Amino acid sequence: MDKEIIIGTRGSKLALIYAQKVKDQLIKLANISDEQIKLKKIVTKGDQVQDKRLSEIGGKGLFSKNIEIELLEGNIDVAVHALKDMPANETENLSTYAYLKRNDPREVLITKNNKKISELNSNAIIGTSSYRREFQIKKIRNDLESKLIRGNVDTRIRKLDEGQYDAIMLSYAGLDALSFNSRISQTFSVSEILPSAGQGIIALQCRSDDQEIKTTLNKINDHHTKLRALTERNVLKVLDGDCETAVGVHSVIEEDKITLEAELFSLDGTQRFYEKKSSNILNCEKLGIEVGKILKEKSKDSYKKK
């Protein structure tokens, strides 16, 4: 490819690290020069409003919609997203086409005194921005309190250090990218806390009819990560939830077998519905649909507002 490629990204430190990673992969694997690739910072609504739950300011797509608009208007060629921030259903005329190799999807706890969750005082306040994490914490210790926290990673850590919270929950992948690993007090296994669907995956989106860009992106796509992403997100598509839907999803591929597990909480967090199934990787997308349907049936739509 000889033409210039413009990559659209959020302007946070973490998002720019992810975008630079994409650029580095294109240079290394797609034989594109450094001079050909430009990064364009785009402000999203999720970045602008930092004091409310995402569900209160518009729900799905708050971190991706403005970037997608730039893509549709032809101002950028590739959009870089954290997959977990994207709506389950694809935007018309766009294609989430390639995925970088998945980083560690696990959840971590950061505390001021390096305490584990079992060592926190009763009624300790844990900062989280998602109902999923809030309900999962209650599953481990129902005497802990959850309180909304928003902002980028360094802002959240600063709020913890200032004493606004006793602990905060974050994804390992983000902390690792920002070299904050030393702050981690506890890393939860996937069996302890199921992550968000697609957590730890950088997704690359382009216009559906841009065959030249698709050919280029295919050179940096990680096949197994793509299969896991499609499988996990099919669970979300079937559930058709929103930002308040508390659902954890994770998959693992071993040789030609993919194993998918998912949990769904009722709207108030008092009920938990769980399913785990395996299939041949050739049927991975069907597996996601099947698990989604089972959870939907088990829950009787108790995860949705009436």
Protein language model features and the residues they cover:
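A conserved helix-loop-strand patch within extracytoplasmic ligand-binding domains
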Residues: 83-84, 92-144
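Short, well-ordered beta-strand segments
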Residues: 6-8, 40, 79, 97, ...
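Short, structured active-site "lid" loops
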Residues: 51-77
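Short glycine-rich anion-binding loops that position phosphate/pyrophosphate groups of nucleotides
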Residues: 83-86, 173-175
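Small-molecule-sensing regulatory modules
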Residues: 2-49, 56, 139-306
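Short, Asp-centered acidic motifs that coordinate Mg2+ and/or phosphate
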Residues: 76-80, 166-167
